[in-house]
Curated annotation (Swiss-Prot):
It is found in: Plastid, Chloroplast. SMART domains: Ribosomal_L2 (SM01383), Ribosomal_L2_C (SM01382). Part of the 50S ribosomal subunit. It holds the Pfam family Ribosomal_L2_C. This is Large ribosomal subunit protein uL2cy. Keywords: Chloroplast, Plastid, Ribonucleoprotein, Ribosomal protein. Transmembrane segments: none annotated.
Length: 276
């Protein structure tokens, strides 16, 4: 990712950075309109996800997470920006005339070829089942399926990468980007390599307006609110929170409370919890 720095003419351009190489010019048959509603509210209109709302209108890009074009070579034609995710996407022209978007693998260049199937070489961008004999232990993978045929659901964010640790019986052991170690069926497929745009965390928006374009609203501390709005609110002047430990706006512990659903079906598949 090539970071472009502006001349220091104003405070916003002095601190802001943009990617100067990746543009957005999507194909009309691979996009569709998306009705964004809720602004972080549920069906009752109550805020369930804070600091969301506004933002620029977006067109959703149809991403091929299933990689159903088997044993047909495709060529990377463009590398484009996607407003719906941090990762870049690339347009693939397949040999049978099909055109699809996939997640951009790190290091992939325009003109490179990719293919998906059961017996394909271990090459960046190729998709194959975890049971393939050509996929050795220690392979870096992304866009991993949880359910066969449903499409990749794990390790899809910018810079995300998982590692194949072991194969035993009908399952494969993976180490996910969060540090979690879990079992997945060997029949599920994955894409070789790491997701591109690794340096997205190093990018500086430079000003508050750029944050609002992304649909992110300001974050307000609970201690400066009124008691009706937050358990930390109220008091004369700069008062302490008045509790032993910080809490959420709904009174639950804010630091270190487990939010995973109890007795979930996949508990038996997780060998080690994610690292904090």
């Amino acid at each position: 990712m090539a970071i472009h720095l502006y001349k220091t003419s104003t405070p916003s351009t002095r601190n802001g950075t943009v990617d100067s190489q990746v543009k957005s010019n999507p194909r009309n048959n691979l996009i569709y309109g998306q009705h964004r509603c809720g602004k972080g509210r549920n069906a009752r209109g109550i805020i369930t996800a804070g600091h969301r709302g506004g933002g620029h209108k977006r067109l959703y890009r149809k991403i091929d997470f299933r990689r159903t074009e088997k044993d047909i070579y495709g060529r990377i034609v463009t590398i484009e920006y996607d407003p719906n995710r941090n990762a870049y996407i690339c347009l693939i022209h397949y040999g049978d005339g099909e055109k699809r978007y996939i997640l951009h693998p790190r290091g992939a260049l325009i003109g490179d070829t990719i293919v998906s199937g059961t017996e394909v070489p271990i090459k960046m961008g190729n998709a194959l089942p975890l049971s393939a004999t050509d996929m050795p232990l220690g392979t870096a993978i992304h866009n991993i399926e949880i359910t066969l045929g449903k499409g990749g659901q794990l390790a899809r964010a910018a810079g995300a990468v998982a590692k194949l640790i072991a194969k035993e019986g009908k399952s494969a052991t993976l180490k996910l980007p969060s540090g979690e170690v879990r079992l997945i069926s060997k029949n599920c497929s994955a894409t070789v390599g790491q997701v591109g745009n690794v340096g997205v965390n190093q990018k500086s928006l430079g000003r508050a307006g750029s944050k609002r374009w992304l649909g992110k609203r300001p974050v307000v501390r609970g201690v400066v609110m009124n008691p009706v709005d937050h358990p930390h609110g109220g008091g004369e002047g700069r008062a302490p929170i008045g509790r032993k430990k910080p809490t959420t706006p709904w009174g639950y512990p804010a630091l270190g409370r487990r939010s995973r659903k109890r007795n979930k079906y996949s508990d038996n598949l997780i060998l080690r919890r994610r690292s904090k």
